[in-house]
Amino acid sequence: MEALGKLKQFDAYPKTLEDFRVKTCGGATVTIVSGLLMLLLFLSELQYYLTTEVHPELYVDKSRGDKLKINIDVLFPHMPCAYLSIDAMDVAGEQQLDVEHNLFKQRLDKDGIPVSSEAERHELGKVEVTVFDPDSLDPDRCESCYGAEAEDIKCCNTCEDVREAYRRRGWAFKNPDTIEQCRREGFSQKMQEQKNEGCQVYGFLEVNKVAGNFHFAPGKSFQQSHVHVHDLQSFGLDNINMTHYIQHLSFGEDYPGIVNPLDHTNVTAPQASMMFQYFVKVVPTVYMKVDGEVLRTNQFSVTRHEKVANGLLGDQGLPGVFVLYELSPMMVKLTEKHRSFTHFLTGVCAIIGGMFTVAGLIDSLIYHSARAIQKKIDLGKTT
């Protein structure tokens, strides 16, 4: 018993008799409010604990021979799909000219609404032109390429075949009305029909994981004296409006929390024949989810430059939208981890202890202030 008596001396929480305790309305109000605040803070701490935290690390990128996937969704409200060409090239010398695989073009009217394709007839003003039936032609025919024949191109049975043969030769495709295939297919009428339309380009490119560029520009692209050029003979520089809206542009798959800086970027061309250049720095990124799934992707930063392209060759540039990218030699590794349970317990204890302490101080202040005022009232000293 004597030992228990000595032990009681260490009690930091001495108790008072129930008869000496006073309960007040102010104390009840403080208790209820502090209890609700404590509950809200606890739920907030619990929600924070149930989320994952991401730990970044930096490494040297040692990956070799990988492909880079570029996701694209860009709108050109004043550039018809028939005029627009998409090309990609890199420092290794690989080129993808007038890319069509994995990339799609959607025609848009002047209000930005998708235009449904009409397979049988096109309306040009008040004149209706019936599109020819290709099945009516001899399937074994071999039509002229108009001087652009090559070892692998002996016959040009369609207007597109002639354009491709001209492109390989590096010749400008000036007057389609002199080409029988184009006249038969109504090429000029189609171009005229789409004159006031826009175009949405969406899909993806797969390129080598080296520095390079891809661009959207009017005219058929080809090589001339080892220089990449576009045939703009039939356009006129004053008619080229490169206003564009980038709905989405990313390098690889999205991961939680990623920010693609070019998403929802709207750029209005201040004048005709503008050249827009986006200089992109791509940072390889590995995102490791808490369940063990590994996502290899990229994040990037970008700066923009624009100028008027008055010429078709040389330093004056080419009208269009150019994305020039280079890859960082460093790789970022992002790892998801569960939050510490001991940290959660510490936070909960801090909330409970802090609220009890603050509530006790407020209750004591209210109680003693009320008693002091009541004493003055009883003594008749209040004014």
Curated annotation (Swiss-Prot):
**Glycosylation-annotated residues:** 241, 266
Location of N-acetylmethionine modifications: 1
Specify the protein's topology with respect to the membrane.
Answer: Multi-pass membrane protein
Q: Which GO terms describe its cellular component?
A: COPII-coated ER to Golgi transport vesicle; endoplasmic reticulum; endoplasmic reticulum membrane; endoplasmic reticulum-Golgi intermediate compartment membrane; Golgi membrane; membrane; retrograde transporter complex, Golgi to ER; transporter complex
Looking up InterPro entries in the UniProt record yields: Erv, Erv_C, Erv_N
What do we know about how this protein assembles, alone or with others? Forms homodimers. May form a heteromeric complex composed of ERGIC1, ERGIC2 and ERGIC3. Within the complex, the interaction with ERGIC1 is direct. Interacts with ERGIC1/ERGIC32. Interacts with ERGIC2, the interaction is required for the stable expression of both proteins. Interacts with MARCHF2. Interacts with alpha1-antitrypsin/SERPINA1 and HP/haptoglobin.
Q: What does this protein do?
A: Possible role in transport between endoplasmic reticulum and Golgi. Positively regulates trafficking of the secretory proteins SERPINA1/alpha1-antitrypsin and HP/haptoglobin.
Q: What is this protein called?
A: Endoplasmic reticulum-Golgi intermediate compartment protein 3
Q: Which organism is it from?
A: Homo sapiens
Q: What is the lineage of its organism?
A: Eukaryota, Metazoa, Chordata, Craniata, Vertebrata
